[in-house]
């Protein structure tokens, strides 16, 4: 087992090295260097998902995930999209029952930009009322697509059967 309480940890296996650090506020940083690659990926995982929502706030985590791409106090939605598109990168996010993850893939030379942009989105987002209406439609479309997926339908039915109407049982 990994000594998860240590602030710094390194594991090496051939050319691959994984480092783990815990920053002052408890943020965990995992890095993996693979020398043969010229690309980089970064993910910011927030330990909040649909299981943390009550009946009145159901869906709010997914909604917030979408809204964080709408801009920050320093960047517009277009600035965020162009930051990744202009370097041939990509960014996206996902909301699950137990986490929300924001991620990007870029060339290794653009990693600092990706980290800075994602961190700005997560820590300094500008939530605008006009964006709520637009994203509501986008999310409803996503939910409808999920209903067309037999795998998603079965998974959601299983979670509901196992967990009942508790938050973790809801999609």
Predicted regions and their residues:
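His/Glu-rich zincin catalytic helix
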Residues: 1-80, 106, 116
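Acidic/histidine-enriched segments that form metal/cofactor-coordinating
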Residues: 1-2, 6, 72-73, 79-171
């Amino acid at each position: 087992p990994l000594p998860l309480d240590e602030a710094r940890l390194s594991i090496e296996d051939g050319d691959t090295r994984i480092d783990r650090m815990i920053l002052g506020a408890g943020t965990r940083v995992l890095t993996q260097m693979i020398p043969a690659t010229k690309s980089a990926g970064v993910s910011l995982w927030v330990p909040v998902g649909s299981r943390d929502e009550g009946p009145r706030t159901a869906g709010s985590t997914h909604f917030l995930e979408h809204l964080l791409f709408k801009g920050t106090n320093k960047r517009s939605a277009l600035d965020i999209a162009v930051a990744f598109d202009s370097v041939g990168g990509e960014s996206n996010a996902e909301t699950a029952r137990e986490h929300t993850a924001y991620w990007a893939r870029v060339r290794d030379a653009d990693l600092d930009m990706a980290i800075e942009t994602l961190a700005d989105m997560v820590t300094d987002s500008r939530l605008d009322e006009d964006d709520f209406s637009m994203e509501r439609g986008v999310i409803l479309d996503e939910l409808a697509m999920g209903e067309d997926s037999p795998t998603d339908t079965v998974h959601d039915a299983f979670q509901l059967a196992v967990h009942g109407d508790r938050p973790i049982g809801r999609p």
